Amino acid sequence: MIDACIAGVLHYAENAGLIEADDRLWARNRLLEALQLDGCDPDCAPAELPLADLLRELTEDAVSRGVAQDNSVARDLFDTKLMGVLTPAPHEVRAKFRSLYAVSPEQATDWFYAFSQNTNYIRRDRIARDQKWVYESAYGPLDITINLSKPEKDPRAIAAAKLAPQSGYPKCALCAENEGYAGRMNHPARQNHRVIPVTINGSGWYLQYSPYVYYNEHCIVFNGTHTPMKIDRAAFRKLLDFVGQFPHYFVGSNADLPIVGGSILSHDHFQGGHYTFAMERAPVEEPVRFRGFDDIRAGIVKWPMSVLRLTGPDSDRLVELADRILRAWRGYTDESAFVFAETDGEPHNTITPIARRRGADYELDLVLRNNITTPEHPLGVFHPHAALHHIKKENIGLIEVMGLAVLPARLKGELAALEQAILSGADIRADETLGKHADWVEELKTRYTFTPENTADILRREVGAVFAQVLEDAGVFKRNETGRAAFRRFLGTADQEGSL
């Protein structure tokens, strides 16, 4: 069976374009070396199994022979090592990308995305486990996902990671030094990972795909230098420069402050892709004019968070206006709206920017963020409030801001258990795991009659409704007359700021 799996992996690699016919013997011997085997039957017919199953068979055999450790992380390290043997060198990948880019940017990214899946860097079998549905909200269709593709470490892997020596190389999971890195118990293997150099705003960056693919062609654009996230004029310029080079992609940045930022603030990076989020579809509901910028269409977007959209043919002009708005927002305080530029020297105001092309025009969405905390809301005033934490308590980053909920894996089991508990009449409040959902379920019971046929659908729909509330909580200026008046006050200040 092992000989058939080796033949199967080689057959897969050739069909996927990772190796050519001339590479067969070389690739087989490289695999044997990685597997610590002295030989195999060269005439063995390939096992007709999906790649994930082939790798699983080879890895389990290696574990049984003591070649790989018996835990989940070690298994990932080992099967990535096997795929690394079959992954073309960076110069080959980049040459192919450049040749396709000369034909069209879209052809280049189509190929690179498929390549990143074919190398098993993007593990398609795990992505397929993610649960996804759409919630029709007042703001348009929101994407709801329960993320199951990020591997959860088993207890043995966690224990091994604690014992593993600490290393400062690579400095973080985004650094270019990850390309080809063997990994360790506390850092993922990346032998099958390739990145594409891109120049934006005159500086060296790289393009790669996220291994977890929250949406179609979910890419990461990261600085070649390990430098902290920073939202400034140069960031706007880089975002618009990128969509100038890849007009079929959007690209955005997480905010640069804790709570309202993403999970990695230490390495400057953007996220983008070939996907239309609900926020992009959302219309401008109130046009705004800025003096001296009659060439730019601006307005407040119909969205639960506070979004200003700028659209125009000249990207330099968008950068100029976005920078004016950012500078005004950084220093803006409106106590009546509970907006404070800083407290005790700690800054609170920043922006989550998203860039795209809309036809021949450039477009920037500027999402106003504030990370102030209070005793009542210790995780953030403009953050999911405590009543929603049973569904989502993590940071609301770029992806959520645009209308895609990335919900924790725990919800898969909890929603299934809740369905059974509701139908059986069990005491949810007394349940150690499900008790956090008790208030929510009691409220749902006042609006629904649950049956075996409708309970799962109701829970999914209401999870979507909670996510819409999460976004409303994260909005600085609330969607009522008071909030709208406060938004207008800020915009007036931003206009004056530019006319001084």
State the predicted function of each range.
Residues 234, 243-266, 272-326, 330-333:
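Catalytic or ion-translocation cores adjacent to nucleophile or general acid/base/metal-coordination motifs
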Residues 1-221, 225-228, 304, 318-322, ...:
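Active-site microenvironments that recognize anionic phosphate/pyrophosphate groups
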Residues 192-194, 224-251:
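Helical scaffold of the NTase/Pol beta-like nucleotidyltransferase catalytic core
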